[in-house]
Amino acid sequence: IVVIDADFSGRGYDLRTTEKNIQLYNQLSGRAGRFSSESLIVYQTLSPEDITLNELIKNNPDEILKKELISRKENSLPPFCRLIAIIISANNQSLSIEGARQIKTRLSKIIGLEIMGPVDSPLLKIKKKFRSRLLIRFNEKSLKQKMVSNLLNSLKISSKIKLTVDVDPVNFS
């Protein structure tokens, strides 16, 4: 079995890239072993030094998951925190950014939130709409999430702006 372009980095801004790559490896190795006792999986990559890829080649997925959890804890990522992504869409980029700034100003009144952004979304324009993002990080689950929800529901924003809220986002695109 040959895996083309097996670069396991976080392309696509997906928090679960490592987990998905382990699942893919398990699926491929299971299929390869169906037909004969000896099988070979070949990875083509631009990053042969990639830690995830090398641990998979050594058939050591548990080590990958341990390292992933340590990294997530050190960087305050789920499951060690909660995240809420807010995507602000508008017909022009300046309106999108300005809407995001106003929302950030309002959210900053809630103590205990770390608000990152606004930044351009990695997928800046979809269906002729410019997108900006805010990412909110916090520790307590229900109280802060409820406060953010209440604040967003009470916002009086321009009808030219659309908000999309993603609680515990899987990716950041």
Where are these regions (language model features)?
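Short, conserved loop/turn and helix-capping segments at secondary-structure boundaries
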Residues: 15-22
